[in-house]
Swiss-Prot record:
InterPro entries: Cdc20/Fizzy, WD40/YVTN_repeat-like_dom_sf, WD40_CDC20-Fz, WD40_repeat_dom_sf, WD40_rpt. One of its GO terms (molecular function) is ubiquitin ligase activator activity. SMART domains: WD40 (SM00320). It comes from Schizosaccharomyces pombe (strain 972 / ATCC 24843) (Fission yeast). Gene3D superfamilies: YVTN repeat-like/Quinoprotein amine dehydrogenase (2.130.10.10). SUPFAM superfamilies: WD40 repeat-like (SSF50978). Signal peptide: none annotated. This is Meiotic fizzy-related protein 1.
Length: 421
């Protein structure tokens, strides 16, 4: 008769199951727990359970030990009030320490806008740009043939001008300092308004059809029209325009300057996205990934040469290009028409506005393009978007003739001075 091996079993722990085995058991049979707890909550629960059942060092070895248990065992010591035996808490001191650790608060997103303004006669036209929030904290909006200004500080609304029934506003854009406003019209003429005097100080001609896109670069105003032409207007010169460029084959609906690089991005109804260097009249890059009109364009304020763009109804994609290398960095199907976009000034995130079917405002993490939040309140496609000067809020305008204000971002922390006082 042969010898039989009998494993050594600790009296206080007859079977030493590893925490990993226990965890698999809980996850396979605890379907109700999974439904009620998710993500961070479930992970914290499993960590607490591990601490209580197996101590601070949960074993991940095999399920049974054949031999001496080498895990740390509480050493015999003199009886003191600090002993676990005398604790009034149902959990161990180690678990208490874990629960006392500060938790990062979960980011909350608004379910509803904090302000809604009526915008009668706000055009439901994908190609126009009728909304801009300037550095002076004044919002400019084009409603039919009129320009209105809304002060975020006082809440006061004033009508700046009415062009008459035959000439509607097609685009508005503040200068960098917010002291002058450029207004594009159906007639192809661009008007420059001085806000302090509330007078038009200049009119710029050159387009034969409506001007839907505007972009400032210091003293130069770039405009794009339905005539497929891009014009650079140097406001320091008495003449009309300094340069004309024509490569788009349909209406130009998106323009954005990256002032740090001196690069201009232009998008059009021909589904093309061009990047220009300010020193050349020929495009630096031509990106053809989109299959619908490219109106939504935005340069990253955090990384040089990173350009985001969004396509229309057929395309629905959000793309990221690196204009320093000329390569496509990322592409994502958002599921609906991308009408407009803006980069957060305080975090590496992108806000996009959308059309059918949800008419939502979406927030994406860069560079993964992971969807962070979706805000739904508009009842028609969200065509217009602008960000507040402090970067905390956005305003959206839609075909439902409303302007809605959302607080999405925290204020940018002040950089500590390195000067020795």
């Amino acid at each position: 008769m042969g010898d039989r091996f009998i494993p050594i079993r600790n009296v206080s722990n007859e079977f030493n199951f590893s925490f990993q085995s226990f965890k698999e058991c809980v996850l396979s049979h605890g379907s109700n727990l999974r439904r009620k707890t998710s993500g961070t909550i479930q992970r914290q629960f499993m960590e607490l359970l591990s601490m209580e059942l197996f101590g601070s060092q949960a074993s991940r070895s095999r399920a049974f030990y054949y031999g001496e248990d080498k895990r740390k065992i509480e050493k015999k010591m003199l009886d003191t009030p600090d002993r676990k035996s005398y604790s009034l808490s149902p959990i161990s001191p180690q678990s208490q320490d874990m629960l006392r650790q500060p938790q990062k608060p979960k980011r909350a997103f608004p379910k509803t806008p904090y302000k809604i303004l009526d915008a009668p006669y706000l055009k439901n036209d994908f190609y126009l740009n009728l909304l801009d929030w300037g550095q002076s904290n004044v919002l400019a909006v084009g409603l039919a043939s009129s320009i209105y200004l809304w002060s975020a500080a006082s809440g006061k609304v004033v009508q700046l001008h009415d062009f008459g029934a035959t000439n509607h506003v097609t685009s508005v854009l503040w200068t960098g300092k917010g002291t002058q406003l450029a207004v594009g019209t159906d007639s192809g003429v661009i008007y420059i308004w001085d806000i302090e005097s509330t007078k038009s100080v200049r009119s710029l001609k050159g387009h034969s059809e409506r001007v839907a896109a505007l972009a400032w670069n210091d003293n130069t105003l770039t405009s794009g029209g339905k005539d497929e032409v891009i014009l650079h207007h140097d406001l320091r010169a008495p003449g009309c325009c300094a340069e004309m460029m024509k490569v788009h084959e349909q209406e130009i609906c998106g323009l954005q300057w990256d002032r740090s690089l001196g690069q201009l991005a232009s998008g059009g109804n021909d589904n093309n996205l061009f990047v220009w260097d300010y020193r050349s009249s020929r495009p630096l890059h031509k990106f053809e990934e989109h299959t619908a009109a490219v109106k939504a364009i935005g340069w990253s304020p955090h990384q040089r040469g990173i350009l985001a763009s969004g396509g229309g109804t057929i395309d629905r994609c959000l793309t990221i290009h690196n204009t320093l290398t000329g390569r496509l960095q990322n592409k994502l199907d958002t599921g609906s028409q991308v009408c407009n976009m803006a980069w957060s000034k305080t975090s590496n995130e992108i806000v996009t506005t959308h059309g059918f079917a949800k008419n939502q405002v979406s927030l994406w993490k860069y560079p993964s393009l992971k969807n962070i939040a979706n805000l739904t309140a508009h009842t028609n496609r969200v065509l217009y978007l602008s960000m507040s000067p402090d970067g905390q809020s956005i305003v959206t305008g839609a075909g439902d003739e409303t302007l809605r204000f959302w607080k999405l971002f925290n204020k940018k922390p002040k950089e500590e001075s390195t000067l020795i006082r």
